Amino acid sequence: MRIWRRAAALLLALCMTVLLAACGEDPNDEKKLSVVMTGTVRTMDPAKVSTAAERTVVQHVFENLMRLNADGTAAHAMARSYTQETALDGSVTYTFQLRTDARWSDGTTVTAHDFVYAWRRLVDPETDSPNADALSMVAGYEQAVLGGTEALQVTAPDDHTLQVVLSGSCPYFIGSVCTAAATMPVQEKAVAAHSNWSGSSLWFVGNGPYERTGDWSDTARLTLHTRAAYHDVKRLGPDRIDLLLKGRQEADASAGKVDIVIGAGGEDAAQGGDPTVGILLVNQMATSMGHPELRRALSLVIDRETAAQTVGQDCRAAEGLVPYGIRTDEGEEFRTANGALIDNDPSTYSERCQGAQALLRQAGYTNAVTLSALNTVTLLYDKSMAQVARQLQQSWESKLGIKVQLEGVESYELTARLENGEFVLALMELTGHYNDASAYLDPWRSSDMRNYGMQYLNAYDILMKIAAGSSSLDARDAYLKDAERLLVENSNIIPLYSRVQPYVIRDEVMGAVSDGMGAWYFGGVNRVS
């Protein structure tokens, strides 16, 4: 009898194997996706991530309230549903109902309290997160970033209800803030257990669709497998994602050999968005820079094409302060919809220099004697930007006769000097932490603590205030457009370049989602023949 049963079992297994082979299916086959990215992954802590590669990994090993679709709209993720209510004082309350079937990778339930903890931790000055201003629209933010984190208006009435109060209307809150890597939930127990909780397979706890497997000490290769306990695991595309981190030259050579290359790809690469822009700050408190004509002249003679090439091959000359990849409230690309505010055409450079010289004369600087009244003009910059600084110095002296001294410092000193207003001219990079034009325009309001240029422009403040309170998406887009134009014309904040993200995706690979700011999600990828 036992022999008969064994024979029957073997026969059944053989039949199943033949049947699966006939259908072209192998139960041992994994749906694999191979991805090469430039950059590094030093952390998987949502509050600490700063590179495109880090944000991409976090999008897979954690899950936020919402997740972006390929068309840029937001789909429900940890949140089953949400409601929105506007109070008489203009504040807006979002109430999210969370999934009850979501689990952390240690098997415990993901709750609303995890979001409260994560968001307050994000803005806590002790966390020292580079992404804290991602929550600047939440009521109580200004008190929270000074240390009173409980002032941040995010609460959990029960385990599966999350309430967030915003200071005012924020059209991008759902589609950008609630999908961001920085605002992912984190488990307080995991964070408290070990200082390197996000970098160790022993201590890491995530709630995402994928989990990191393999050798965690290998910083050049990350292997992600679907997490069996994920609530929507059956709808995932790849079973396994192999993410290789390479330098630019190696990544370029990988195009066509792997499914997706991000941050490289050679001449055939498409150009995606990157959240970083390079700017020249003119300190409004510096008396020598008081003439708007002088500031405009400094801006006009800058050869931005050369400056961008000097910074790196993944840079383009700035056409405004808001870079490509940032969307309007209506879903268009802000830069494309509003056009270029800065002329970078090489054929008109000579004409622009003549215009700059005319502006200088209007400001009263007609000869070497009058120019000497400027006294010492110093350009402060991070030492890594020395070539760009020298280029600007040469342009200002050769085209305008203005001599500028250069002062290169370490990045930590640059930050301190900017915060204290100890500069006349300074080079800096600004990185937006959410996909909206206000991420680049808000910092230059008179009351904003990030207003290093100490710009006090009443008309600009009014435009930004009206935009923030506008209930019309069309009107808000128009106000932001006008505010950017005014900012560029005033020339205290002078855009120089914006970074871009090249990428190559095989034709048969569909469903990769970019947030327009460098991070990607591959959980919905499928292959088509």
Which functions belong to the PLM regions below?
Residues 111-118, 159-165, 238-240, 275-324, ...:
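Alpha-helical secondary-structure segments
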Residues 217-219, 349-353, 357-432:
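Ligand/substrate-recognition segments at binding pockets and active sites
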Residues 301-332, 384-393, 419-529:
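Detector for C-terminal structural segments
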Residues 36-87, 205:
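N-terminal lobe/hinge region of extracytoplasmic solute-binding protein
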Residues 81-134, 163, 288-290:
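Aromatic- and charge-enriched surface segment that lines or borders ligand/interaction sites
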